[in-house]
Amino acid sequence: MKIHSVKFNFAMNMLLTVSNFLFPLITFPYVSRVLSPIGTGKVAFAYSIVSYFSIFAAFGVANYGIRACAQVRDDKEKLSKTVQEILLINMILMSFVYVVYFLGIVFVPELKVEKTLFLISGLNILFTIVGVEWLYKGIEQYFYITIRSIIFKFIAFVLVFTCVKTESDYSGYAFIIIFATVGSGFVNLYNLRKIITIKYFSNYDFKRHLKPMMTFFITTIAVTFYVNVSVALLGFIQGNEEVGYYNAAYRIKDVMVSIVTSLGAVLLPRLSYYIENNMWDKFNDILSKSTQFIFILSLPLVVFCILFAKPSVLILAGSAYLGSIIPLQVLALIIFIVGLSNLTGIQMLIPLKKEKYLCYSVVIAAVINMLLNLILIPEYGAIGAAVSVMVAEASILIYQIYILRAYSQVLFSGVSYMRIIMALALAIIVSIWLNINLNYNETIVFLVSASLFFICYLGVLLLSKEPFIFTILNQIRSKLTKN
């Protein structure tokens, strides 16, 4: 089993992130026009409800499984036993979850009225459990994960344009989304025999997993709660139209966040492995570089979403979603906030086995988000939901930075603050000037302004010899010279 370098894994995960970006980028403009805000709102509402059941079945395995597998990846016997123990726990819990879910569809009026949609959406629970994605990430098989995911997304891409034709096709669209995101779980399950030994162990130890899984479970349910409670409350209080506005803005924000956090997904298993083997110098070096990466990448994306919120919404969702513009501008701040909290939480607290603090921070955020939602959504709708989530995310970051204050020198000393500020300032000035003075089609103005925004930003960083950028360029130049 070959373990690739962090750079290779990052490249693969970035390719995966790009594919995750392209799928909604290409399909959502079409789907949003066909299904309308009401149709997309129904799908988002169903998915938010199903997500709660999925996290009960998964029981915190997403991050715990990665860490547990990364720590024993060099011992096939221990890895096989660990995977079987975790998977059996998940399968038992999934059985109970499905019983409750089906009872909900039968007896809850809001679910019963869309029975077909919720039955289809419920497949997400099964696919998530049998997919054992945490194993493949734990042993850093990002090449396999990426290629497999791209194939399934391509099939889903074809299905969207061939099967979603009218406003009543929202249930079919829900199935396609599930197929694209977690449908490959059965392929993972089939390939499992190539990675671990499928046999009975006489000394199964389920108990050792329960406490950390419970901590991760509470964390996950709190995250899902404060993320999806906004959609649920919008649906119950304001109706599907406001859900559609919020969902469109949230989708655009999510694409940006996934780009910024793509490195963190790769580093969790590697950092867990370094700590398990007392390789602290490598641990600190990667954390410093990760912080620089987040600052350099996330800040221009935040500014971009604020400056270009209107054209982004019009191009990606259409004029029916003008109500998404202000929510997107508010949610844009989350790109930077989550970038850093992903670093402090996923890349640091979990490998350091301090996941209880991650749990505390998320529970605090869930309470804050719930209270703000109840206050703001009745009056401000989607905008209020966006503000609530943004404040909740900020509270997570503040708490985690306080817990990890001993690492502040390692994290923040290498960031080129002035170079980034100068680059952003010039990019903003150029973009605003172009928007004011170019008298062309709005789409052309947007494409030109957006392109020059990033060109100016990167150009200033290069001219000012920003260390992180120059290190990457030197490594690329070195590889090209060798070849």
What are these regions (language model features)?
Residues M1-K2, V6, F143, Y170-I177, ...:
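Interhelical loop/hinge segments that connect adjacent transmembrane helices in multipass membrane
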Residues M1-L25, E77-S80, N203-T219, D281, ...:
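N-terminal membrane topogenesis motif
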Residues H4-N63, Y98, F102, F157, ...:
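Signature of the first transmembrane helix
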Residues F28-P29, A58-D74, A249, D254-T291, ...:
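Helix-loop junctions and terminal segments of transmembrane helices
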Residues G122, T146-K194, P212, V363-I368, ...:
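Hydrophobic alpha-helical transmembrane segments
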Residues I432-N483:
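Membrane-proximal transmembrane or re-entrant/amphipathic helices at the cytosolic face
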